[in-house]
């Protein structure tokens, strides 16, 4: 599905969508009753019913998503350009945060695998930038993997950290600023982030901390496709870190992400139908 061609939709309408794979209304394309035989009508009805059933069970058929579990274990200390528009460099690999009993890279990978299962069960194709604890590709290379696959959306999965143990909740970081190699991704990324963050916080009950524009992230600046970064919670918060270690809560995050992707897809289709 050419999702990126449908990005002109309004966010307000998108947030009204709550289903995942609800059948769209409209004409069935069958012939008028006075010109079709009973057999033809039955066949057309069967085809329509089959299409509706497929849409309900596979609402993300034709959609391709890149899941990027942040960080990973590595001893590499190389740097890379932060943007195709700048000579400034940053570390190509970053270790990530650490909470009591878990590291961020472990959490990110575990949730990404659960999310992959949710998305594939709904018909989506999924590209993973990392499937082991080792980091074998840099931040720039992760972006290129999504670009080369021509995915409809890249979702970067991370966890937050703070000096104080007080902050909690989920947020989305979105691409912004003059270093974006593909400025056209800014608006559709923000639209997707808003919808998916709403779905995840609704599913988990976590505080919605909103969107944070970022102009300094290599993965955003090299991206040619809509890209968002989910901060699942604070490992520095004792209670939230404990929740993030449970399979039940991780599964809720995965379900919330998949629900959000369904709602995002519906919002894009709704926008196209209004044009």
Spans of model-derived segments:
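N-terminal, intrinsically disordered, polar/charged segments of Gram-positive cell-envelope systems
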Residues: 24-64
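Active-site-adjacent substrate-binding region
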Residues: 187-213
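Solvent-exposed loop/turn segments at secondary-structure junctions
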Residues: 71-74, 104, 132-136, 159-164, ...
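Active-site-adjacent mobile loop/cap segments within catalytic or ligand-binding domains
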Residues: 156-164, 173, 208-275
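Mature extracellular/periplasmic domains of secretome proteins
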Residues: 139-152, 217-223
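A short, glycine/acidic-enriched catalytic loop
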Residues: 78-99, 162-189, 195
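C-terminal motif of bacterial Sec signal peptides marking the signal peptidase cleavage site
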Residues: 16-19
């Amino acid at each position: 599905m050419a999702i990126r061609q449908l990005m002109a939709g309004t966010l307000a309408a998108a947030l009204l969508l709550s289903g995942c794979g609800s059948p769209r209304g409209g004409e069935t394309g069958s012939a008028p009753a006075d010109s079709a035989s009973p057999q033809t009508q039955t066949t057309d009805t069967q085809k329509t019913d089959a299409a509706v059933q497929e849409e309900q069970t596979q609402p993300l058929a034709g959609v391709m998503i890149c899941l990027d579990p942040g960080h990973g274990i590595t001893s590499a200390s190389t740097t890379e350009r932060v943007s195709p528009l700048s000579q400034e460099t940053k570390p190509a690999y970053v270790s990530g945060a650490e909470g009591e009993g878990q590291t961020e890279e472990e959490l990110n990978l575990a949730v990404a695998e659960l999310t992959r299962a949710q998305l594939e069960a709904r018909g989506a194709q999924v590209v993973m930038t990392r499937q082991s604890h080792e980091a074998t590709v840099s931040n720039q290379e992760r972006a290129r993997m999504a670009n080369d696959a021509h995915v409809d959306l890249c979702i970067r999965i991370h966890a937050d950290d703070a000096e104080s143990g007080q902050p909690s909740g989920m947020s989305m970081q979105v691409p912004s600023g003059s270093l974006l190699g593909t400025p056209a991704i800014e608006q559709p990324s923000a639209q997707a982030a808003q919808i998916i963050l709403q779905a995840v916080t609704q599913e988990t009950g976590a505080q919605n901390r909103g969107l944070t524009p970022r102009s300094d992230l290599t993965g955003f600046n090299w991206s040619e496709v809509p890209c968002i970064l989910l901060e699942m919670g604070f490992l520095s918060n004792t209670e939230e870190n404990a929740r993030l270690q449970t399979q039940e809560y991780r599964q809720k995050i995965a379900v919330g992400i998949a629900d959000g992707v369904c709602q995002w897809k519906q919002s894009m289709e709704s926008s196209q139908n209004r044009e």
